[in-house]
Amino acid sequence: MQGIDVSYSDEVGFLTKGDRDWEDWIMQLLLMAKKEIGKDNAQEMSINFVDEDRSQAINRDYRDKDRPTDVISFAIEDGDDGLDLAMFTQDPDFTEDIGDLFMCPSVIERHSKEYGTGFDREFGYTIVHGYLHLNCYDHIEPDEAKEMFGIQGKVLEEYGLPLYPDQLDEGRGK
């Protein structure tokens, strides 16, 4: 399995908080999720850490929701154009640009308190959730949700950040 090239933009100084190597921690989760969904080709993406004002502006402008949110994903390939990436992935030099994540650490922190999950688990949930969206997973329909949340649950469990039992199929709710 080839890796993921992640470029970062950190408008809020998140990556330098504490003594954790956040980039390494994030990469471990991303690679586990990549393996779980069977993506062998090289990928690239960006992760942008933003404040609540920027998160709200993006959410309002692109999703018509006038509130800050934990993560917003902009997938390059949404699976709706009929393009078969398989013909490209056989090329050893092909790197799939999967898109961009905009993450708001202060909203993630607030969610961790609201849901009683702790920051690490909530952050892990959010990064894996966003990554799956960039890889054309969604949770609009019940069968899609079951698949997506099942993958999230497995990755987080293996990493030591388990979900609540009912989150494996239903999402975040307790």
From Swiss-Prot:
Its cofactor is Zn(2+). It comes from the Bacteria. Binds 1 zinc ion. It is found in: Cytoplasm. Zn(2+) binds at H129, H133, H139. GO terms for cellular component: cytoplasm. It holds the Pfam family YbeY. GO terms for molecular function: metalloendopeptidase activity; RNA endonuclease activity; zinc ion binding. Keywords: Cytoplasm, Endonuclease, Hydrolase, Metal-binding, Nuclease, Ribosome biogenesis, rRNA processing, Zinc. Its EC number is 3.1.-.-. GO terms for biological process: rRNA processing. Single strand-specific metallo-endoribonuclease involved in late-stage 70S ribosome quality control and in maturation of the 3' terminus of the 16S rRNA. Belongs to the endoribonuclease YbeY family. This is Endoribonuclease YbeY. The lineage of its organism: Bacteria, Bacillati, Bacillota, Bacilli, Lactobacillales.
